[in-house]
Amino acid sequence: MYNYLGESMKYRLYKIVKCVGTPLFKLIFRPTIIGKENIPLDGRVIICGKHTSNLDAAFMISVPDRIVHTLAKKELFNSKIGNAFFRSMGCISVNRSIHDENAKSEAINVLNNEGAIALFPEGTVNKTDKIILPFKYGAVSFASKTHSPIVPFVITGKYKLFRKSITIEYGKAYYVGDDLEKENEKLQNTIINMLKRKEKDGK
């Protein structure tokens, strides 16, 4: 298993949180997980989808059978405790008010070293009535620069305590071309179509 976290202590903390947190998460929210087999067990990959809640990040850690690095807003790193914890969990700090070149470089470095990145192209939790917010170009840009496959996902339902009311579905992995505008539109449409299919199926 690729370990971009580097230090063994950080690796152990990630494993502890995953081992303890995953059963609790599944016990409390009882999620339905579809298409987990579409996430490669090793090698570079970008996992991305619609952002419905701050709890979505729990799926990024609990479901894949590997270390997954997530992009998180820099405000979470402001305190010493927050900075130590989130970096130990493999999170990459992103300043959303600028084109954060440091975050981009760190994400690309993870992928070039055969790691996994999870991100939400909308850039924030979607609290609107729109099915999806316009996608930023980070996911397709990283995929193009590092020749990493994208695994799209959708989360449907609501997070309700001790009720089987939330579902995450992972789609098939695919590679992008060089036309980032076209590929960003394709990614957005892929996720929209997955959401519409879930709605049609009543799931």
Predicted segments with their positions:
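Short acidic-hydrophobic, aromatic-tinged amphipathic segments that line or gate anion-handling sites
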Residues: I33-I34, I92-N95, V176
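N-terminal membrane-anchoring alpha-helices
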Residues: Y2-R30
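A secondary-structure boundary/capping signal
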Residues: G35, A72-K73, G90, F120-P121, ...
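Small-molecule pocket liners
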Residues: F29, V68, I166
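Short gly/ser/thr-rich secondary-structure transition/capping motifs
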Residues: K26-I34, I98-E101
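Non-catalytic C-terminal accessory region of glycerolipid acyltransferases
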Residues: N3-R12, K104-K203
